[in-house]
């Protein structure tokens, strides 16, 4: 049923964006004729699936890139809080890396609900964001403006982790600011509130990040942990 809906949507999408019948393969993967598994790379920036996690990098997975910034040439230009152009239950997975913290807390809840909506019943979410518990430990010891680690964009301080990378926050890039934060407990709570039933999460204090795998319909603890081996880094 959703396949026919997706085919109609593809025609509207192609007309709106000037695409001909030789659609990009990523967009074609929204149709009912796509073979293989599909994951939505939310807030992708310039990254491709090779920059995600090993589980998504195999040929078994088709990547669909979504970003609000048209300059990064995503397959779909949209906000993660409104993905209404993506049919319900279409996708096998959603990957969200370091973008939920750019939303206010209420917006983050909306985004998580959207992630849940577009997933098939056996689909899952992989999400990562800063670990505020690890950052708070540095701040409590008066290291607010000292380098916590060095990223490809340069040195990162606890201040950058909390509020957004200051070297990038220049007009018109103010949307790069951070507006919410999570510990592992509060991230799990937010994901469950959005409708996900089972979660497997870890803290990586030395990397100052959280990783969470959430299944839409529910798996046994053992099955969830096996799945996490390919999609959650050590």
Task: Indicate where each model-derived feature is located.
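A general structural signal for short secondary-structure junctions and capping/turn motifs
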Residues: 29-33, 55-56, 203-204
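Membrane-proximal basic amphipathic "stem/tether" segments
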Residues: 1-33
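Conserved long hydrophobic alpha-helices within structured protein cores
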Residues: 31-45, 151-159
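Generic structural microfeature
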Residues: 6, 34-37, 182, 209
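Conserved SAM-binding loop
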Residues: 37-137, 212-216
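S-adenosyl-L-methionine-dependent methyltransferase catalytic module, highlighting the catalytic core
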Residues: 107-110, 114, 120, 124-234
């Amino acid at each position: 049923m959703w396949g026919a809906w997706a085919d109609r949507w593809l025609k509207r999408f192609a007309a709106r964006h000037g695409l001909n019948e030789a659609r990009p393969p990523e967009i074609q993967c929204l149709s009912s004729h796509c073979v293989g598994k599909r994951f939505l790379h939310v807030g992708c920036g310039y990254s491709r699936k090779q920059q995600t996690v090993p589980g998504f990098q195999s040929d078994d997975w088709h990547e669909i890139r979504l970003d609000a910034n048209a300059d990064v040439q995503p397959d779909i230009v949209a906000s993660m809080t409104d993905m209404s152009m993506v049919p319900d239950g279409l996708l096998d997975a959603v990957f969200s890396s370091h973008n939920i913290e750019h939303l206010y807390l209420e917006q983050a809840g909306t985004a998580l609900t959207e992630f849940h909506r577009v997933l098939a019943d056996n689909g899952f979410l992989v999400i990562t964001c800063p670990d505020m518990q690890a950052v708070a430990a540095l701040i409590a010891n008066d290291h607010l403006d000292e380098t916590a680690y060095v990223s490809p964009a340069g040195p990162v301080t606890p201040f950058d982790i909390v509020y957004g990378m200051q070297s990038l926050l220049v007009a018109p890039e103010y949307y790069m600011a951070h507006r919410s934060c999570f510990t592992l407990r509060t991230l799990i709570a937010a994901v469950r509130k959005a409708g996900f039933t089972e979660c497997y999460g870890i803290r990586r204090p030395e990397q100052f990040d959280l990783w969470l795998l959430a299944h839409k319909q529910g798996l046994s603890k053992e099955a969830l942990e096996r799945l996490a081996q390919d999609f959650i880094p050590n």
